[in-house]
Amino acid sequence: MSNPQQLRYSKEHEWLSALEDGVATIGITEYAANALGDVVYAQLPEVGDTVTAGETCGELESTKSVSDLYSPVTGEVTAANQDVVDDPSLVNSAPFEGGWLFKVRVAEEPADLLSADEYTAFSGN
């Protein structure tokens, strides 16, 4: 399993893209997707919602369990991936591409995000 070098990672197994005009794309890692099993339902934050770093903002339901979704940053949601709502299996099949979850206009990027190498060491994958 490979964690893309250009992304940053949280200890809750979310990834965050580099800021583009102050907006970051967020998803869960391949490690988290594999641990969840087949995702069958996604409840994502809605456009206009304010999310807070480290707090729950949605959930993913798999054939194994229901898991809270945490935001790695604080800010306003600018997009939610309707494709994932319609086809939650995208989280498993393409966690770093089509399986992204939501986008946030970042108010403040936390300092505790990990590099790809740090996340790999943390997760063991």
Swiss-Prot record:
Cofactor: (R)-lipoate
Keywords, alphabetical: Lipoyl
GO cellular component: cytosol; glycine cleavage complex
Entry-annotated residues carrying N6-lipoyllysine: K64
Superkingdom: Bacteria
Gene3D superfamilies noted in UniProt: 2.40.50.100
Cofactor note: Binds 1 lipoyl cofactor covalently.
PROSITE patterns for the chain: BIOTINYL_LIPOYL, LIPOYL
Domain called Lipoyl-binding: residue spans: 23-105
GO-annotated biological processes: glycine decarboxylation via glycine cleavage system
Alphabetized InterPro entries for the sequence: 2-oxoA_DH_lipoyl-BS (IPR003016), Biotin_lipoyl (IPR000089), GCV_H (IPR002930), GCV_H/Fam206 (IPR033753), GCV_H_sub (IPR017453), Single_hybrid_motif (IPR011053)
Assembly, per entry: The glycine cleavage system is composed of four proteins: P, T, L and H.
Function (record text): The glycine cleavage system catalyzes the degradation of glycine. The H protein shuttles the methylamine group of glycine from the P protein to the T protein.
Alphabetical list of HAMAP family matching this protein: GcvH
Family to which the UniProt record says this protein belongs: Belongs to the GcvH family.
Protein name listed in UniProt: Glycine cleavage system H protein
